[in-house]
Amino acid sequence: MSDAEGQGFVHLRVRSAYSLLEGAIKADQIGKLAAEAKMPAAGLADRANLFGALEYSSYAKDAGVQPIIGCAIPVVGIGGGPTERWARAPTLMLLAQNERGYLNLSELSSIAYLDSAELPEPVVPWAKVAEHSEGLILLSGGTDGPVDALFAAGKTAEASAALAEMHRVFGDRFYVELQRHGLPRQAAAEPGLVNWAYDHDVPLVATNDVYFAKPGFYDAHDALLCISDGAFVGQDERRRVTPEHWFKPAEEMRKLFADLPEACDNTLDIARRCAFMVHKRDPILPSFPTGDGRNEAEELEHQAREGLKMRLEGLTLSAPEEEYWKRLDFELGIIKKMGFPGYFLIVSDFIKWGKAHGIPVGPGRGSGAGSLVAWVLTITDLDPLRFGLLFERFLNPERVSMPDFDVDFCQERREEVISYVQEKYGRDRVAQIITFGSLQARAVLRDVGRVMQLPLGLVDRLCKMVPNNPAAPVTLAQAIDLEPRLKQAKKEDANVSACLDVALQLEGLFRNASTHAAGLVIGDRPLTQLTPLYKDPRSDLPATQFNMKWVESAGLVKFDFLGLKTLTVLDRAVKHLKKRGFEIDLGKLPFDDAKTYELLASGQTVGVFQLESQGMRDTLRKMRCGSIEEITALISLYRPGPMDNIDTFVDCKFGRKPVDTLHPSLEAVLKETYGVIVYQEQVMQIAQILAGYSLGEADLLRRAMGKKKKEEMDLQKIRFVSGAKEKNVPEEQSGSIFELVAKFAGYGFNKSHAAAYAFISYQTAWLKANTPVEFFAASMSLDLSNTDKLAVFHQDARRFGITVRAPDVNRSGADFEVENGEVLYALGAIRNVGLEAMKHLVAVRAEGGPFRDVFDFVERIDPRQVNKRAIENLARAGAFDSIHKNRAQIVASADVLIAHAQSCHADRQGGQGGLFGSDPGAGRPRLSKTENWNQVDLLDEELSAVGFYLTGHPLEDMVGMLRRRRTVMLAEAMAQAEAGAEAFRMCGVVRRRQERASQSGEKFAFVSLSDPTGEYEVLYPPESLRKCRDVLEPGKAVAIKVRAKARDGEVRFFGDDAEPIEKAVENVVAGLRVHLSPSAAEIDALKRRLEPAQAQKGGEVTFVAAIGGGREIELRLPGRYTLDAALRGALKTAPGVALLEDV
């Protein structure tokens, strides 16, 4: 190092943004700060973690600065603990001298997380620090360490003992640390530290605990700590640092420690001693165990050739067989040359294990579906020759990069495959990958507004001014430039200005750590030798401390184990069919099923993989897919950008426009997509056919076109035109084709991925078209807790003529089941009952037979699992109807029933079963004397338990009255709107109302309603909402006036008016005929039910009773009655009432 003694200084304690919500300097900025300050080195010092070690090393090296890799390790078992209530475990500063030291530091950081899962924070016992001390320099910890507080408290003996122990373990690699941030406790501790150091000939070292880069960042950093701790900036008792905790220049540090210049000199000495940096590595894979003495390349070739023989057996070939063998030899040659046989074998192995154990595996994902070797190894299930898929899109010999298979597994059994991989390669060699959430524009604005205690309404308005576009996030600075109201608020309100200024400084800093949804790494050695490890409390697996980018730089190879819900749906549907005696292999379905394509053309694709959004369903109606290739094209086209070409595709398909294949030689490439360039593979093939590119070169061209770098594009155009000229294509024509292809290449889709997902789309569509009952049961089981989605499926099932039966404790399963061509509603889908509790219920029933009555039920279940709330909601949902009709009585008696259940359970636990001898009724409590709910109340209670109307609808008895007011139901409105009708009177019960602000600030609303034929949504613009808001309350029955707009099979409703349903029918009904069954109660009892409904205006009521011989007798009651839903419900549930009829 060139710095002269007495002048230089090196910061050894820099907290990066990886000290989450504490450090405010990004890892790539530390080296730049040091270089600007003319410091030869800088030390990373994040608390407990090494998240940024490799990243910092790389960027510091680029800045010409020596990275020092350190970590502030929280320790227990030495010195004193925290003295302030918000303080955490004390830390010791450890710095890596060499590779051995770095590996030990990695081990200690890993221990902090992996061994502290049950503790409030990561900590390391001092004994572990001592065990892993080789190659590490120890600083005594400063203000946050285990010694300073003891000296400050006058506990000199304890402090001295702790320092002596550190010195014993680390010897000449131990430094006593001094800090001067102006804190009283530092001044109180310093004499003891200096005296001990001089007495024991241990060097002093000066450090500044750096949290932020410049003095002006202090206020923003203070807010950051408040975000971390859930505190407020204006709060007195809270954690804070001082304005001195910044990256001070060397001269300031020298001035601060002018009385102890050696303490600054020793920062340079330590920097010299720490001549190690974390290096990037080439990819490292575990060795794959092979058979018969073969190496990995030979094993791959052996498995691939045997696999192709098996694939070709019984296959309808899409090309001559020699083409398959030729392609196999080509791919194997590239895989061997690039050194990836082991990768293919590892992936194939865990997929084969999954399939052998009955775990559903997807047919492929991403560009890997273009590999024939992947197909013959059963990594994928798509014949790439059949679908025209390219290997070079996956693995390009012209551009060396790791292959990357993304594998979809059944989401319920994915963990089993991961466990297999752990057992095969070693639990210490398999880990997930960490990810970091950051403070993005809206979130940081909301957080800063909260800690600065701005009014919640104001903060909410500010946040809504920031555009929300997850696909292309807008920064806060961009939002202020783009949104005049935000700029105006900043100008007019000092508090808003201060909030925005702080938020702008904090935006982009890391907020939290989590784990990658699917990525795993597998090492050839214990992973702590390659990366430190982290433990997410929500996962059983450890995770790497380096994120996706840097874990690959560390040499680890990522394997993606994704959980795909649709695979679980498919598996469950197949199992339902197997119970009926139908064995089906979805992987062998023919691609020419007429019912499937009829379903797709109808757009009735709720629940069909990739094809269920409203926009996609509209496009299906236009496109009328007739092949798997067209489904593949649709999946590729239905995205921003390519979507503009859907109309051209459809018009060319149906002959409304001519197909333009650009050049005769390209007809085979573009014929499948009617002249529209849809796929990246088409771009590659055009370059190959027209301009003589190899497919490897064509993949590089595709990438260049996607990046749109002008210099590179200019060179590629010269190459393209030149190559085309050699094939006798005029320069003008080839140049225009190049420009057209370049335009499409920017948003061309990966055909391999689209084809693989089209395969799953076809399978789900086939099931829905051919076995809809099993499809709905399986689909609904995978959305047990999503009542909105269950309501959609229920409505869709009705369209398919499928009955969804109410839950029943004696018939239903915990999941949705199939019985006699109907779907049985799942007990586990009832709100607030608990899936595990319902599995217990089903197990009890399976062991002891059906429940005889509600007492038998509570006497057999475990009340610790099926609690009072579960009993109440089972009753509300009608699950006890088969053994106890009175739902209201069970709800009213829930306390009694659960107490009886607890008593019986205690008896069983005490070995006193059968206490009441042969009389099962003995000792049973009395149920509350409660009448059952009327029909309206019953449906409302059912709604509360199920989330939607399942067995009936509050308005179904009013349909006749409503029709007299020319009110139509949803099903009729849809049909009439598609036929051209535009204005309707409709009705419904309001499910929810979501209000939003327009650009002008006025409120409009999306109102969800349900009528007896289904659920629908109406958009109420501001002027309509203003006059109808009070009527459109959730739970209210309303009659509405709407305008309808129909396009491509989709109907949208726009609200003009709304009124209570009672008002809509008050002058409509002439009367009501009440048909009585032979078992009818006394007429007087029915009259009493009518008394509350007597009114000046209303309809007449007539009782009708059969008297034999096909004759009836009528009794018209005097007076008039309000014939609303409440009265109808009361009559409908009265004993002996058979039918209500409007007249």
From Swiss-Prot:
Name of the top EC class for this enzyme: transferase
Main location group: cytoplasm
InterPro entries: DNA_pol3_alpha_NTPase_dom (IPR011708), DNA_pol3_alpha_thumb_dom (IPR041931), DNA_pol3_finger (IPR040982), DnaE2/DnaE/PolC (IPR004805), DNAPol_HHH (IPR029460), NA-bd_OB_tRNA (IPR004365), PHP_dom (IPR004013), Pol/His_phosphatase_N (IPR003141)
Compartment annotation: Cytoplasm
GO MF terms held by the record: 3'-5' exonuclease activity; DNA-directed DNA polymerase activity; nucleic acid binding
Pfam families (UniProt xref): DNA_pol3_alpha, DNA_pol3_finger, HHH_6, PHP, tRNA_anti-codon
The enzyme's E.C. designation: 2.7.7.7
Top-rank taxon, per record: Bacteria
Keywords assigned: Cytoplasm, DNA replication, DNA-directed DNA polymerase, Nucleotidyltransferase, Transferase
Reactions the enzyme catalyzes: DNA(n) + a 2'-deoxyribonucleoside 5'-triphosphate = DNA(n+1) + diphosphate
GO biological process: DNA replication
GO CC aspect terms: cytoplasm
Family: Belongs to the DNA polymerase type-C family. DnaE subfamily.
Purpose of the protein: DNA polymerase III is a complex, multichain enzyme responsible for most of the replicative synthesis in bacteria. This DNA polymerase also exhibits 3' to 5' exonuclease activity. The alpha chain is the DNA polymerase.
NCBIfam families: polc, PRK05673.1
Subunit: DNA polymerase III contains a core (composed of alpha, epsilon and theta chains) that associates with a tau subunit. This core dimerizes to form the PolIII' complex. PolIII' associates with the gamma complex (composed of gamma, delta, delta', psi and chi chains) and with the beta chain to form the complete DNA polymerase III complex.
Name of the featured protein: DNA polymerase III subunit alpha
Organism, as annotated: Caulobacter vibrioides (strain NA1000 / CB15N) (Caulobacter crescentus)
